[in-house]
Amino acid sequence: MSVLVATLLFLMAARAPESSAEHADLVLLSAKIWTGDSTRPQATALAARGGRIVAVGSDAEVGKLRGPKTVVVDGKGRRVVPGFIDSHTHMSMGGFNLLAVDLRHTKDPADFTRKLAAFARTRPAGLWMTDGAWDHQVWADPVLPTRALLDPATGDRPACLSRTDGHMAVCNSRALALARVSRETPDPPGGVIVRDARGEPTGLLKDAAMDLVWAVRPARTASEVEEALRIAVRHAAENGVTSVQDLPGNAADLDAWEVLRREGKLTVRVDYRPSLSEWQKARDRRARMKNDEWLRIGGVKGYVDGSLGSSTALFFEPYADDSKTSGVYASEAIPLEKLEARVAAADAAGLQVEVHAIGDRANAEILAVFERVAKRNGAKDRRFRIEHAQHLRRADITRFAKLGVIASMQPYHAIDDGRWAQKRIGLERSRTTYAFRSLLDAGALLAFGSDWDVAPLSPISGIDAAVNRRTLDGKNPKGWIPEQKIGVEEALRAYTSTAARAGFAEKEKGSLAVGKLADFVVLSRDVLSIPPGEIPDTRVDATVVGGQIVYSR
């Protein structure tokens, strides 16, 4: 009897009219979909329901899921790719920079001063001026700015303006006075107070020395941080970025992210990564959080060194343009045993660990640290990451795959730094700079990001940089260190499936397959078939997150 009843119920269900619950919330048709899924790499249509993909296939197959309330997107033959995952962002900093004076594209010191003075006139007296994202390397004469350049433009307003890489700032006399930085102030561990021939501070502070001024700057309010993140979230949608790994953040940033999460204002998924130095707090906060597909703590980030642009990246040999220095260790890597102890403790606590390393010595040192910690803590799927992995010795390239270390890299830096890097480190070391091709050929996992706000958030710009390597000054039309170019599909994977794997999220996103999150991007041009030189002309036409259109051009 029970078998008969079950059979009848099955037949009734099979013959029942299609219910609204079976209809898709969104259907995309007539597209050229690169799914990133090896089981079905190409399709023309997909459907989403409840924020996830319920069908991928042909128009005929997927079109059956249309209902009266289904949002239908006409792909018009355009290229569709999985939502871009940015493996390295500084979202609040990016938001604040969109609100601040933009000094990134100034032409020379005089232009720098003009723009700064014009912005200062819009600011109340006494209010701090920060950010700026200046880059002296774009000037014809790349002389570093000093407080003498700032003082006439800023008046009595304290000003400390960060270089685009975030590893150096130039401060005016008012800010230095408030921080009590003088000729008697010693360089802090991991930092440099740049001085003139008389020993007086020029206003330039490198790495840990910047903290002397940041310590006296009023903290940003919760509402200010929230507004900066709202602006950053909109900017992400405009660029087709559907997920970010946001690092290294502080408690104020995470509090603001949680406010946006509760308000339902998130249109980008956030994998938040606090500082390695606060790994215990990260562990405890993660235990209290919901940690869903919108907001979670994924790991912690540390530092070994500084940056190439600030001459604080750590190398085995001195800089070619300054033989007195080979770079510096970051303060948390002095001594290196301190950093190693934190890596080991965070790893044992179940946190993914990623460490910033730019110079070849910094990369060699952290690879050795990762190897020792893995042996000490035992085998597991830990996915250690090196952020930037910028300058590598040839012998260290193969160690990434051997040790299972992910190279989390930002390709736009290659076409930016490539204008002047060779002057700083010479030709031989440049050959394994941003070594995308060599790392992939050695079997390493390559995850891409932007390092926004240091570089533009645009993944299209990043793909162009990885594929073409044409420097921003136009002097390398065939590519700077062209042997390190990679293909478009390889770059796409670094921004999608491998980026997802770099955050332990490959089961949720990074490719377009049934059951995964319905995050995808509609592009104006087919980056997989157009001449590579035309990639920069590509625009994001639409961004879809969780089956909802969050941006449309």
Question: Where would I find each of the regions flagged by the language model?
Answer:
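Divalent metal-binding segments
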Residues: 14, 21-29, 34, 38-284, ...
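Short, gly/Ser/Thr-rich active-site loops of penicillin-recognizing serine hydrolases
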Residues: 235, 552-553
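Non-cysteine beta-strand/loop elements that form the S-adenosyl-L-methionine
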Residues: 294-312, 404-415
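A generic structural signal for residues embedded in beta-strands
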Residues: 55-56, 131, 520-523, 552
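Bacterial N-terminal signal peptides
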Residues: 2-13
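His/Asp/Glu-enriched, well-ordered alpha-helical/loop segment
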Residues: 343-354, 358-384, 388, 394-398, ...
